[in-house]
Structure formats: structure tokens, C-alpha cells
Amino acid sequence: KFHPASYVEMAYEAGQRIFGESRVQELVDKWERLRESYPDIVWHFIGPLQTNKVKYIAPFISMIESVTSERLLAEVCRQAQRVGRTIPILLEVHVAEEETKSGFTPDEIRALVTRIHDEPELYRGVALHGLMAMASHVEDEAKISEEFASVHRLFEELRASGLLLSPELFTELSMGMSGDYPLALREGATLIRIGSAIFGDRA
């Protein structure tokens, strides 16, 4: 994110295929520029997503990792149905201490998964593939590790709950960024969101 499409091309040539972007316009611009030359790039949306912007990425996005509210989820469902797609999503869990971080509490996640199980017709257009989380921005590695571990426990609880409509799809735990990804990997992350450690500081 915040890096030019040429950086994506370089990473692609090095073997990377999954790319995350956190701004809708930048994502659309990169997709339009690269889609013909690099049709196998897998685009994930990983940042705050406004409901009125979902329509711009619904036709091509491979996964929305940052579903943070029921209102946003409803709009993703609506736009996915509009374009005849099923969009893979992750539900973002709010475990960090900062109020600025967004997402569902663990109890809200449990309640939402139960609703999706009980009323699947309300959630057509999305497929639940797992959870996403951002840890607190602190130096205390023990605190960060415990936050990641708590999300992993919730992930495993949901996998064993019998409430997932497609349990075989519920495989992704996206947590960890450039500053804390080793801790996330130790706590079970399957996706890590590495930007500056590969591309340098944001432009």
C-alpha cells in the first residue's frame, strides 16, 4: 500500500502473487494497470473500507480482510450479488487496546457467526474464510503475543463450533505486520501483512 504499481511488478517477478491494498482508489488504479499483464495477481483489501466504496472493488477483489461491521458486511453482500460473485471475507476482531482500531469484539463475532448459520439467505454473496486482527501498537511483546493468541483461540473455537456454513473454507488467520509478524506467526497466523519490511517506508 502507498507504493507504485512498479513495486508490485518487481515483487511479482520475485514470486509474490498476493498483494494487499488499503485504499480503494489506489487498488483500482493498480488493478486496471496490471490486470492484463499479470492476470494471476490476487488482490486483498486490508484497510478501512467505507460502504460507499465497496462497489468499486466488488467486481474483482479476491478477498476483503477488513470487514469491521454488520453495515459493511451487508453492503459487501449487496454488491457481490449485484456483480454475481461470492466474495471471500475475513471478519476483523478488535483485540487491541487503542480505540482507533476497529472491528468486532469476540462476542460480536460469535453472535454474527450464529446469525449467518441461522439466516444464510441474508448473507448471500460472501464466504467466510477466517479472521483478521491488528495488535496493540506497543513495545510489550508479551501483550502483543497474547492478543494474537486470543484471536487464534477464537478462530479454533469457531472452527469447532459446528456453526460455520463452509468449515472447509474457514482457514485464514490474518495477523501480523512488518513490526510484529514473527509473533503472529508463532501464534498461528496464516496470512501476514508485510509492507515496509519489503518495500520500504510508505511514500
Language model features: what each stretch is:
Residues 2-181, 185-187, 199:
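Conserved alpha/beta-domain cores
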Residues 189-203:
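Gly/Pro- and small hydrophobic-enriched strand-loop and loop-to-helix capping segments
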